[in-house]
Amino acid sequence: MRDVELLMPAGNLEKLEYAIRYGANAVYLGIVDFSLRAMRKGEIITLDNLKNAVDLAHTLGAKAYLTLNIFAFNNDIELLEKSIDKLKESNPDAVIVSDFGVINLVKKYMPETPLHISTQTNTLNYESVKFWRDFGASRVILARELAIKDIAEIRRRVPDIELESFIHGSQCVSFSGRCLLSDYFTNGERKANHGNCSQPCRWSYKLVESTRPDQYYEINQDERGSHILSPKDLCLVEHLKELIDAGVDSLKVEGRTKSLYYVSAVAKTYRNALDELKQNTDADMHKYFIELQKVGNRGYTTGFALGENTPDSYSYNISKGLAGADFLFEFHGKQDDSYLVKIKNKIHLNDEVEIITPTEQFITKILEIKNKDGEEQPLGNTNDDVYLKFEKAPEDYKYALARTIGVKEYVSKA
């Protein structure tokens, strides 16, 4: 089977490094002013560290794509013109774009940089792909609404351009994210297409008849209301072979605002799946679907990949992300046979935990917990820095993470 690119999100420099070390061939990143994500303070890539981020990716042997897919107003264009020199100096391997004004500036000031056409352009057919190819794009990121058979038809008719497709992550209830609900419900304060969506599709709704304004009716038999607009998360790990056979060149995971653990665990799972498929095209991928249940999700669906979406693709009683396993701690150092960790969720002496690293994955037991003063304690609380001893320790603790073992039963697939 031919090699394809595993493309992971990079919300900051740390996530960028973990994504690559856990298996990504490329990362996509953006700065707040020009990409469709509003990052939390302290977790952003800025104009000042953008070059460092791209250089780090290159040092680790991966590509870095700069996301400039904002729908730009006049003031955005003016800001982009002022920033274009630093963007160019960062030397990204490509820029991801959707707005024609932004595209025009990139072609003018960064003519040697490849153009990747964002999924925000809703590219659904081969004529659109031909248009972007003739316009000078080197890659089109296809709309999530395409079935695999449609991708194959596009590839058959347009063989001379790269195709990128989403394989995992949150989905917008609107066509490829072009939603106005957030803007409407927040009186223009939180625009989805400027990276600040309030996610009204995740809110709980009840039915009201106009002549009975004080009577609220449940849409579903659930005391919390019905999340009728909330789509499940996309998961196509069991359909990687079909996507590759259809002609996809890059497999993309959503999630620049997701956690370090999420990015690492998802990258590792898809890397292992792709590596096994390369050795055996008949390999059973279901074990990787089970593995992906250990990260945050709203239940899984194949979306439009196998044909039309169905009611089962929506989460009627899940509005917030859940996880089949809890992220417990990350490794920060070593002293003799003890490991310094930062705790993310409470741990106890003798707990069994699962440790993952870029090259390992195993279950072990916590044999000792000590605080920084060397005092033994029966547990460690969230945000504590403690020293741990294990029944079995990782061969290389750098970039190691730990989580609970087992998978909760709520996760579903449509």
Question: How should these model regions be labeled?
Answer:
Residues 1-22, 26-38, 53-54, 60-70, ...:
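Surface-exposed amphipathic alpha-helical tracts and adjacent flexible/coil segments at the periphery
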